[in-house]
A protein has these predicted regions:
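Juxtamembrane and boundary regions of transmembrane helices in multi-pass small-molecule transporters
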Residues: 1-24, 142-146, 161-264, 413-472
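Short, amphipathic, aromatic/basic-enriched membrane-interface segments that mark the entry/exit
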Residues: 2-6, 25-34, 54-58, 113-121, ...
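Lipid-exposed faces of alpha-helical membrane segments in multi-pass integral membrane proteins
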Residues: 12-19, 40-47, 62, 66, ...
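Membrane-interface helix termini and inter-helical loops of multi-pass transporters
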Residues: 26-32, 73-81, 109, 207-216, ...
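Structural signature of hydrophobic alpha-helical transmembrane segments
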Residues: 27-40, 83-95, 292-302, 352-364, ...
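Flexible hinge motifs at transmembrane-helix junctions and intramembrane kinks/re-entrant loops
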Residues: 28-32, 36, 43-61, 231, ...
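Transmembrane alpha-helix interface/packing and boundary motifs in multi-pass membrane proteins
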Residues: 46-55, 132-141, 182-193, 283-289, ...
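Membrane-embedded alpha-helical segments and adjacent helix-loop junctions characteristic
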Residues: 57-167, 319, 323-325, 329-400
């Protein structure tokens, strides 16, 4: 029997959880015992998600069990938490994204972009980011997008130009492309409700915490201008900060053409995938007008993929990331919801809002975003960070007088952009960093600069855009 449990990493979450629990007699008068117990369990669970003594799914199940065992919720009500439609949207979209990988359509699209725009290294970077942008609406796992589709293309392309860490030639091309893809992946994740697993969580928490209704369309409309500006500006800044030594890539077109010839003509499965993707995209855009929500759209798309044979039930069962996400996100969202229902989040929001009482709401919101962003150095998952802090921060912003929809969307966008911090910040980070093309020091320093760029574009220009379209 292989024991993969790292028992020492349980020490910190258990100690912190027990200390908070033991402080129950000294809790604020505004909170009841149940709210304080829930807070202790939630904090312990989040810390365990960070220290990772077990996989995050296993940790969440233990937290769920303790929550029910101590009587905070009864079993029936707790199990109903696994029926959250926003989380099922994530799972369904995981399955849809598997179709891009299985059919080879994602790879074909990437190669076509390289063939069309790959004459220069900078153009190559823009073309790869463009592929990420196209795939993002139907790929809620930005890890799958970066690791399953984009990274193999970048690695093969870099090696074909003699750029490998092993030979000390990573600066030729690979380092620039790897880091640009990382940043582009975060930007596209922020642009669509269905482009990163944490976004539907933010949508759900916004509804429960501040009664804000976020749709696929209003998220996209709000994000499109700062998103497109970021996709144009950020690769160019990286090009200037960390320039590749190979700036012309005349052979890229030939390489891509050879790879496409090797793939052969577009298959029937790929044609089905294209058609179903467009059906899903149209329904996500128009769903709020025809009463088809984003989750139902994802179910429709998956049903069509199964009916056409693009995916089979074994594919669904083997998509372990979806089932894992369904379990641990359900538990964390359930816990956050209980904190809200038991009065802890409203109390905390009022407390922080009172302490920031001398400031206007724009200053409060900016301070909250800065805190949200830089506290991510303590997290190894953007989605876990959103699950842990989004509701409380949104509550504080609204209590300070900030427009609810504007605040919910801005915090939602930065729930993605905050991954521009470390090499362990989110799923794509360790995949791309582990390739060896970019050193840890360089990774952190460039992220430090780009964090400021994101503040200027998304808070500055993004706020002006959202005011112009009436979302502020």
């Amino acid at each position: 029997m292989e024991n993969t449990v790292k028992y020492r990493k349980f020490i910190l979450p258990i100690v912190v959880g027990l200390i908070i629990w033991a402080l129950t007699p000294f809790k604020p008068d505004a909170l009841n015992d149940q709210a304080w117990y829930m807070f202790a369990i939630f904090v312990a669970t989040i810390i365990a998600c960070i220290t990772q003594p077990m996989t995050i799914g296993a940790v969440s199940i233990i937290g769920f069990t303790i929550m029910v065992l101590v009587g905070i919720m009864d079993t029936k009500s707790a199990v109903e938490g696994f029926g959250n439609s926003s989380i099922w949207l994530i799972a369904m979209a995981f399955f849809i994204s598997r179709g891009f990988v299985k059919t080879g359509l994602g790879r074909r699209i990437a190669l076509q972009f390289v063939k069309l725009f790959g004459k220069k290294t900078l153009g190559l970077a823009y073309s790869l980011v463009g592929v990420d942008l196209i795939l993002a609406p139907a790929t809620p796992s930005n890890t799958a997008r970066a690791g399953g589709i984009m990274f193999p293309i970048i690695k093969s392309l870099s090696e074909s130009f003699g750029s490998t860490p092993k030979d000390g030639t990573e600066r030729k091309m690979g380092a620039f492309l790897i880091f640009t893809e990382f940043q582009g992946n975060l930007i596209t994740a922020a642009m669509f409700l269905t482009a990163m697993a944490g976004n539907p969580i933010a949508q759900s928490l916004a509804e429960k915490t501040a009664h804000v209704h976020i749709t696929w369309m209003n998220w996209f409309v709000a994000a499109i201008v700062p998103g497109l500006i970021s996709l144009i500006v950020v690769p160019f800044i990286i090009y200037k900060m960390y320039p590749p030594t190979v700036k012309e890539t005349p052979n890229a077109k030939k390489w891509a053409t050879e790879q496409l010839e090797e793939m052969g003509k577009i298959s029937l499965a790929e044609k089905f995938m294209i058609g179903i993707f467009f059906v899903a995209l149209i329904l996500w855009i128009t769903g709020s007008f025809i009463n088809i929500d984003a989750t139902l759209t994802a179910f429709i798309a998956l049903s069509l993929l199964l009916l056409t044979g693009v995916l089979n039930w074994k594919d669904i069962l083997n998509e372990t990331g979806a089932w894992n996400t369904l379990v641990w996100f359900s538990v964390l969202v359930l816990m956050a919801d209980q904190l809200n229902k038991l009065g802890f989040i409203p109390w905390l929001s009022k407390l922080i809002a009172h302490s920031l009482g001398g400031f206007s709401w724009p200053i409060v919101l900016v301070l909250l975003i800065l805190f949200f962003f830089y506290s991510h150095y303590l997290f190894a998952s953007a989605t876990a960070h959103v699950s842990a802090m989004y509701a409380a921060l949104l509550g504080v912003a609204v209590a300070a007088g900030a427009p609810p929809l504007f605040s919910a969307l801005m915090l939602g966008f930065f729930g993605n952009l905050l991954a521009s911090t470390t090499h362990y910040s989110s799923g794509p980070a360790p995949i791309l960093y582990a390739s060896g093309y970019v050193s840890q020091k360089r990774w952190w320093l460039m992220n430090l600069v780009l964090g400021i760029v994101y503040f200027i574009i998304w808070i500055g220009l993004g706020s002006l855009w959202m005011k112009l379209i009436g979302m502020m």
